[in-house]
Amino acid sequence: MTGSSLTRTLLLFKTLWGWSDSLDLASERAQREGFDGLEVNLDHPCLESMPAVEVRRRLDRCEQRLIVEIVTGGDYTPSLQWSPDDHLAQLDQDLKRATALQPEKINLITGSDSWSDPIQDDFLAALLDRIEAVPVGVMLETHRSRSLFDPWRLPSRLQRFPRLRLTADLSHWCAVTERLMTPDLAPVQAMAGRVDHIHARVGHPQGPSVSHPFAPEWAEALDAHRRCWQLFLDQSVPSDQPFTITPEFGPDGYMPQQPFSGEPLADVQAINAEMASWLRSSLTMPAADS
């Protein structure tokens, strides 16, 4: 036998972004919809005042795994008053809290797009030192308003920081660059072997979310994202750790709304379930070497 006999499994996670019910109801619905686990913000109301052991018990009852999301800076768009040291101080506390939940992985939305390149580099170096001590995989998300907001700077950062692992959310970069991300682009090529988790939302050149990924008017955008996601799977390092994807259509101005009424154009819960099913049939994990 030559090469590695390991092959990564693919797991799909249900996002609790915008979820207003209990953890129990989320776990039960995720199980019905065929998800393998939940992705939840560390400060989500459904976890409030619940001991870590109780969170695990409730997830295990529905055979659901867990990805924890940590957001620094006060909100998803970070306060400009927060310094790098402020972000790092929060991470010191939140990484301990997240680890206690025994997650599959931890996703970080951190840093600020307002910092200069030297400050960004110092922040990332300090952050990666902290991640070294965490017993589960920790990824930084390619999120607008954050340290990895700019795709064109990413290749040099990946060279500078070989320990940096990524959550790929290409929809943010569509909005930042006013173009679709495609597999031929330098940042997509550079990041392919560093991606451990995907946020599968479909963006377009004018925004981070289409109204419905399976509407025919968005076919080009869906296919561009799918080809990038498949590249990430193809370039993933053989491992006994699963590759994970979270369909992440959501609220907060991402899902377009009807004028005047403010009603969403589509049901994000239904879209995410449909997206998970589509991803299972449309993406292929590379076979193990033999």
Describe each model-derived feature in a short phrase.
Residues 4-16, 38-40, 66-71, 106-108, ...:
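Hydrophobic faces of well-ordered beta-strands that scaffold small-molecule active sites
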Residues 1-93, 99, 273-290:
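N-terminal pre-domain/capping segments
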Residues 55-74, 124-135, 161, 226-230:
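Alpha-helix-loop-beta-strand connector modules within alpha/beta enzyme cores
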Residues 72-89, 114-119, 209-220, 254-264:
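Surface-exposed, active-site-proximal loop segments in enzymatic domains
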Residues 13-18, 41-45, 71-75, 111-113, ...:
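Active-site beta-loop-alpha junctions enriched in small/polar residues
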Residues 52-55, 84-91, 120-126, 151-155, ...:
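Charged helix-capping and loop-helix junction motifs
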Residues 2-5, 24-31, 155, 160-164, ...:
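Histidine-acidic metal/acid-base catalytic patches
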Residues 80-165:
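Active-site acidic/histidine proton-transfer and metal-coordination neighborhood
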